[in-house]
Amino acid sequence: MSADSAWYLYLLECTGDSIYTGITTDVARRFAEHLSGKGAKYTRSRKPIRVLGQLRFDTKSEALKAEIEIKRLSSTQKRAFCAQLPATEPAR
């Protein structure tokens, strides 16, 4: 599988100490969309501060399944999950 077809689960720290979870093929691009107000409705009212973590998947289906599981976690559990992820380049 080429890197171009990879999907990523990503978590954003947002204002109000909240965490947004989503999937994309390009975390840096998607983070920029959230910052510009063109991302999800959630991040229009709770501005993103930084990318907490990201995890690569080979297929969109795998990423969607992981997104559903992560969205069920509490904020504390999501932060613990991110703390265990391998270090990645920050989204710009």
Swiss-Prot record:
| Signal peptide residue numbers | none
Occurrences of domain GIY-YIG (ranges): 5-80
Q: InterPro entries of this UniProt entry?
A: GIY-YIG_endonuc, GIY-YIG_endonuc_sf, UPF0213_domain
Fetch the PROSITE patterns from UniProt: GIY_YIG (PS50164)
The record's listing under CDD domains reads: GIY-YIG_UPF0213
Which PANTHER family did the record assign? Answer: UPF0213 PROTEIN YHBQ
Q: What is this protein called?
A: UPF0213 protein H16_B0156
Organismal lineage: Bacteria, Pseudomonadati, Pseudomonadota, Betaproteobacteria, Burkholderiales
